[in-house]
Amino acid sequence: MKTCWRSLLRDLRTIKDMKKILTCLLATLGLTTACGQQNFENTDVQGFAELIADTSVVVLDVRTAAEFAEGHIQRAILIDQGQSDFVEKAKAALPIDKTIAVYCRSGRRSANAAGRLTDVGYKCVNLKGGIMAWQGANMPVTKE
């Protein structure tokens, strides 16, 4: 009889442990899903080119000044997203009522910048693959 009770208690502890593990897994899944949500659009080179053909769309390059000098998309405004005052500079330079077409070298920094800008009210579209994809598709860049 004693062994039966011990076995039952052990099983109950195991069930409680499983509930805790399941709860933690579900919480982690929920947090991962929430963190993975984007509040901006990603587009490919063709979509980006069509978007910026509309001159009311603001083109934003978020790379460094040195990268920008090597070549950038026509009409691009440079605001380095790596600077601590990036959002403040963006607020001062970019109209809140216009779509912002954001790019960087590979698409990672611009995705970060697009997320930060949409958090403060901007509508952003990120170029997947960045200027590397743009140039890879033989799209024009300028040094002017």
Regions picked out by a protein language model, each given a short descriptive name:
Residues 59-61:
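Structural scaffold elements adjacent to functional motifs in cytosolic proteins
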Residues 103:
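Short, surface-exposed ligand- or partner-binding patches at beta-edge/loop junctions that are enriched
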Residues 25:
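Charged (Asp/Glu and Lys/Arg) segments that form or flank catalytic channels of large polymer-
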Residues 28-29:
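Repetitive helical segments and hydrophobic/amphipathic motifs
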Residues 3, 19-22, 32-51, 57, ...:
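Rhodanese-like catalytic fold shared by cysteine-dependent sulfurtransferases
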